[in-house]
Regions:
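Hydrophobic structural segments
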Residues: 1-284
Length: 284
């Protein structure tokens, strides 16, 4: 099977128009006519990940976070991104990224988190009024426009966040410990612990602070996400339990989503979940 067939399968599952307007999901590096020798699935593409792909005989890397995000002005040896690009090109390794299109897809990143927390059929939110997109970023570049990189503007994305209902209410401290255990997180940053039980849980992998008002309006008892701006913690004690577990920790099971899509849609393609830990943050 050719790399382009794997790419097409991934984009059927998480169409590129689902990505935010500032994103750069899709093909990053390489030629897609080559036969797939193996697909290495990862959260981030680093030099170590490329080395692992070589070692494990994979000529395709599928990541969640794009390697090429803010654009390259040169391909030399000035930083880790440039070195990673050069290494992948030299070794004829194709790099594909499924980022906010996978975040926003039905059965994507947030559904996987819900599955980890014990619910396989979480609810998607009702259509929300227009608001800003996830994060702050510059407008599309001419090259992105030429490649058809678009966002969905103010339309609701099906998986931008999801709501699950726990089988039984949990005391807040027990809930936080449960999330840490299920998501393999070392710690969690929270606001004041709730005095009432938690049962309705909103989920957004990665940086989800832009959704806080939405999940409160939807009646969530708790909000599990990967990043939260300091000032967002203020003013919500006893209104909602904020549970921030780290960007990497909230998304590192995304490789299982990618694996399931490829194995279902591209039978015979060998999938390897990367063993390289690319989390740049260390808790000391």
């Amino acid at each position: 099977m050719k790399i382009k067939q794997v790419l097409e399968a991934l984009e059927r599952f998480a169409p590129l128009p689902l990505q935010e307007s500032w994103d750069n999901a899709g093909l990053q590096i390489g030629l897609t006519e080559a036969e797939v020798s193996g697909a290495l699935l990862c959260l981030d593409v680093t030099e170590s990940v490329v080395d692992e792909a070589i070692r494990r005989g994979c000529n395709l890397i599928v990541s969640h976070h794009p390697l090429l995000f803010r654009g390259l002005k040169q391909v030399a040896d000035m930083n880790d991104v440039q070195r990673t690009v050069r290494r992948a090109i030299k070794e004829d390794i194709c790099v594909v990224s499924m980022h906010t299109n996978l975040d926003n897809a039905q059965d994507g990143v947030n559904f996987k988190i819900a599955e980890r927390l014990g619910q396989t059929c979480p609810q998607t939110p009702p259509p929300a009024p227009p608001r800003k997109e996830r994060g702050e970023a510059p407008p599309l570049t001419p090259s992105q426009k030429e490649r058809g990189i678009v966002g969905m503007g103010d339309e609701q994305k099906p998986g931008q966040w999801v709501m699950l209902t726990l089988e039984a209410p949990m005391e807040s401290r027990t809930f936080v410990e449960y999330v840490k255990d299920r998501m393999e997180a070392q710690c969690a940053m929270c606001n004041g612990l709730m005095h009432r039980p938690i049962q309705k849980v909103a989920i957004c992998g990665g940086a989800g602070d832009f959704l806080l008002d939405d999940v409160i309006a939807a009646g969530a008892d708790a909000f599990v996400t990967g990043e939260m701006n300091y000032h967002q913690y203020f003013g919500h004690e006893q209104e909602i339990q904020i549970c921030v577990i780290g960007h990497y920790e909230s998304e590192h099971f995304t490789t299982e989503v990618l694996r399931d899509v490829i194995e279902r849609e591209c039978p015979g393609v060998r999938c390897c979940i990367a063993e390289t830990n690319t989390n740049p943050i260390r808790w000391v």
